[in-house]
Curated annotation (Swiss-Prot):
Name assigned to this protein: PDCD10 and GCKIII kinases-associated protein 1
GO annotation, biological process: regulation of cell cycle
Phosphoserine modification, residue list: S60, S64, S107, S237, S240
Functional note: Acts as a tumor suppressor. Acts as a tumor suppressor for colorectal cancer cell proliferation by targeting KEAP1/USP17/ELK1/CDK6 axis.
GO MF annotation terms: RNA binding
Keyword Cytoplasm: no
UniProt-annotated stretches for the region Disordered: 40-89, 253-286
Gene that produces this protein: Pgcka1
Subunit (UniProt): Interacts with KEAP1; this interaction prevents the ubiquitination of KEAP1 by TRIM25, thus protecting KEAP1 from degradation. Found in association with PDCD10 and members of the STE20 kinases, such as STK24, STK25 and STK26.
Length: 313
């Protein structure tokens, strides 16, 4: 029994020692376990950890991720040297950022539990906004926090009536009643039918076309210059005014240049013809009272008087 084979058999039977192989993790992942069974893994430092079935199927994760996920859980027994070195680094990162990972995990878990318990209110948008406001309230600063605080009063101000119809409060309706009312204009407009049915003479006076060329100060405007829309009564009034003006001018002229000697009977005929010559313009042209015109008229009268005297002799 002292040979090498006997000693090896005796050691396997009476002193079993488990030596961890480098690929033991793959062996654990490949084994098929039942739902309620758990596997106890023995490490080199005699630390036992219970691993459920769901954790065994996720063995594709790296060692660093598995160690980071179990930092917040209590450990049984001493940790390996690598874990003890990485744990202070994680704690330093949490202190630098100002937010611990455990606090964020707890807040997320509490929000999920609250949503599961209140499943009936989860579908409404108002509850979603209120929950988000309570979760994000510590992180809001300045104007964002003010806007979030003003959200609830505005929602309370609106009144829901019927099947979701919103109505403004009574104060807004009272303000709307004070809007000034502008009455309709009293004056007739250009496109109104009252202007179309107006008197034709007034309409002609309103829409009278004035000539672009302004007349001279000493000459009265002609009838043709007043436009084609002037009625017959206005034309007759203009003609009468022109005739009266010409007769007054001629009468004043003959009074100033009265005859110094008695004229024969033939002069009366010439005098009757002269006004027709001066008054021949019926369109309102007024004779200018210049010195040259007066001299020409005097010479014409003298010539006609001499011819009449020769005929009488």
């Amino acid at each position: 029994m002292g040979c090498r084979c006997c000693k090896m058999i005796q050691s396997y039977l009476f002193d079993p020692v488990q030596v961890p192989s480098p690929g033991f993790v793959n062996e654990v992942n490949n084994c098929k376990l039942e739902e309620d069974d758990t596997v106890r893994l023995k490490g080199t430092q005699n630390s036992e950890v219970e691993v459920p079935r769901n954790a065994l199927h996720d063995g594709s994760l790296s060692n660093s991720e598995s160690r980071g996920s179990t930092t917040g859980l209590p450990h049984q027994g001493p940790l390996p040297q690598e874990d003890s070195e990485e744990r202070p680094c994680v704690e330093k990162q949490g202190i630098v950022n100002g937010i611990s990972p455990t606090a964020t995990l707890q807040s997320v878990r509490s929000s999920r539990l609250h949503q599961v318990d209140n499943s009936s209110w989860a579908s409404s948008p108002w509850v979603a906004t209120i929950d988000s406001a309570h979760l994000a309230q510590p992180f809001l600063e300045g104007e964002d926090y003010r806007k979030q605080s003003c959200l609830l009063p505005t929602l309370e101000g609106t009144q829901m009536v019927g099947h979701g119809d919103c109505r403004a409060p009574a104060e807004a309706l009272a303000v709307a009643d004070h809007i000034p009312y502008i009455p309709a204009p009293d004056y007739p407009q250009l496109w109104s039918p009252t202007v179309d049915n107006a008197d034709p003479e007034e309409k002609d006076c309103l829409f009278e076309n004035h000539s672009e060329v302004e007349p001279l100060p000493g000459i009265q405007p002609r009838v043709s210059q007043l436009g084609l829309n002037v009625p017959f009564s206005l034309q007759r009034s203009w003609d009468s005014l022109n005739e009266a003006g010409t007769t007054e001018v001629l009468s004043d002229y003959f009074k100033e240049e009265g005859p110094t000697h008695p004229t024969p009977a033939a002069d009366s005929g010439s005098e009757r013809e002269d006004p027709h010559t001066y008054n021949g313009d019926r369109e309102g042209v007024v004779v200018d009272e210049d010195a040259e015109v007066a001299e020409a008229l005097a010479a014409l009268e003298a010539a006609t008087a001499g011819e009449d005297a020769d005929d009488a002799d």
